[in-house]
């Protein structure tokens, strides 16, 4: 909640306002994906003799869809395989008993990714391409969030700004900023990212990787004099910065957290109006204005019989001529000169029968060592945004507060988000959004049981508020660790894992691999340095691994 940009010194803030914006330009792989995407020459060139060649794309999440879309534009024929539904962790659902899916004004719940930072300019490129609109997401203490309640150890505090909270929260904010400046050259790295100063980015980051690769997030805090107080560390873990508490990330590598704060990945979030799953679905149907080989009006859907992707992949193996042979759930067997795997990488260890020859042994080790975060959510539809009603005291006098607020707590629910669709219109509450151990607490319970526990927990914070009477449909819930094609919400490296992540990330540079280990490319969340907000970048790199660039450097040269 104590977001870093609100805590910089005044002179730094003034300087930042006048400087170029922060984007996800690094720090691990400083490359201007936004400029690359905007180049009129496109992303690369495929020889005419290769036009129409089929390329398997396994996984229909955003990375897979972007990969297929860009391959199609160069004249190749992507063949998409998807085990469940297009969208991956961009999963938007409707509620039973409410307006039907596709109906104007239908209530939706974002079961996966639901908020995106402006700094993810490659992601925004495709949002704009798909004609989608965004709106501010109601994070704790965000400018467009009406109010926030922090409930810790039975003490409840109401706030519209940070200044409304007790002084200890400001102390925690200052401690976090001091920790970043002293231990991670925060302002220096942000300045380099704004200026896209590649030598300076590499200088700072290389030093930090050497120093901090074996350090946990919690250890980084403990090493800082600013966080010598356990109480400050405890509050920081429960309340955090940007989107809320971060104690579930305490065991992870501090390098993961630095990527988030350096690049503004947790700041100024926006949600997609109508749901994030529209993005991959619209790209599936989108007809590019400029394509090679294919006639005008060609889309990914048009290249697939019945407009549907092929089913789940059940086997991957290499065959003569260094081809990749794919078997799907119907028993159909097809062989390709190249394939791109964008699904959750543990699928290669469990759901899909794979040859060891698909990857070098060190890459298999990196896949096996991938670490995933558990995550659970539950949403309910309500009749209207009743939380904006003025609260009253025992005498019926207005208190000056909202009836209910975006809520951060150390209770079972942890994070509660209020999603407003306008005055007197049906709305949605995310009763609980949890991670890791907090998520596992919900795993044995079904949606109804979860809702009952959540309503009881929130009733202890808001004893005068009857949430139940406003609910107009059945709850929807997800535990990503229990989803058979995901087994977790997203990748988060543990200390010492930098070498594994670099190995997977640079896999697209296949001229470095033995000749008999080429042709199968890795992409997606698990391969990117960061989470869902950057899979378009990994898809672009994979696409560049297949194409030749007309005299301008693509992602490949940067990997050196």
Region spans (language model):
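Conserved flavin/dinucleotide-binding core of flavoenzymes
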Residues: 2-42, 323, 381, 388-560
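Mobile amphipathic helical/loop "lid" adjacent to a hydrophobic cofactor/ligand pocket
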Residues: 7-10, 15, 24-26, 128-129, ...
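N-terminal Rossmann-like FAD-binding beta1-loop-alpha1 element of flavoenzymes
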Residues: 50-80
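Core beta-strand elements of the Rossmann-like FAD/NAD(P) dinucleotide-binding domain
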Residues: 51-53, 329-338
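Glycine-rich FAD pyrophosphate-binding loop
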Residues: 72-98
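Active-site/ligand-binding neighborhood in enzyme catalytic cores
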Residues: 195-312, 319-321, 345-347, 352
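Conserved beta-strand-loop-beta-strand element in the redox core of flavoprotein oxidoreductases
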Residues: 310-334
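Flavin (primarily FAD) binding-site architecture
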Residues: 338-362
